[in-house]
């Protein structure tokens, strides 16, 4: 049985509240789970201590049993110091595309031409 540590949504419309649960990966998001190990209330301010609550002992137990945390839960565990999130390395993501590079080169060329024309007219 593939176990996941994931979020199960509760609360009402426009007022989300999430339980951090251990569940079989095949069960529905808000369906059957094995154990509730914490909660997350995104409606509280970011510095509120009750925003994220985790039972560290049970989290460690389930990770030792082979449960895989989802991306969002892994962020919470990393903040709490219970698990390490791998560093993301995608250096090509910030590089502009071909068209953007061509437009930047054209704009640079126009600026150089304008500066040269201004210097030429000032010299006369």
From Swiss-Prot:
Ranges where the record places region Disordered: 82-124
InterPro entries referenced in this protein's UniProt entry, alphabetically: Ribosomal_bS16, Ribosomal_bS16_dom_sf
Gene Ontology cellular component annotations, sorted alphabetically: cytoplasm; small ribosomal subunit
Ranges of Basic and acidic residues composition bias in the record: 99-113
UniProtKB keywords: Ribonucleoprotein, Ribosomal protein
One of the GO BP terms on file: translation
Superkingdom: Bacteria
Biased composition (Low complexity): 114-124
Entry's Gene Ontology molecular function annotations: structural constituent of ribosome
Similarity remark: Belongs to the bacterial ribosomal protein bS16 family.
HAMAP family: Ribosomal_bS16
Protein name in the entry: Small ribosomal subunit protein bS16
Organism: Sinorhizobium fredii (strain NBRC 101917 / NGR234)
Gene: rpsP
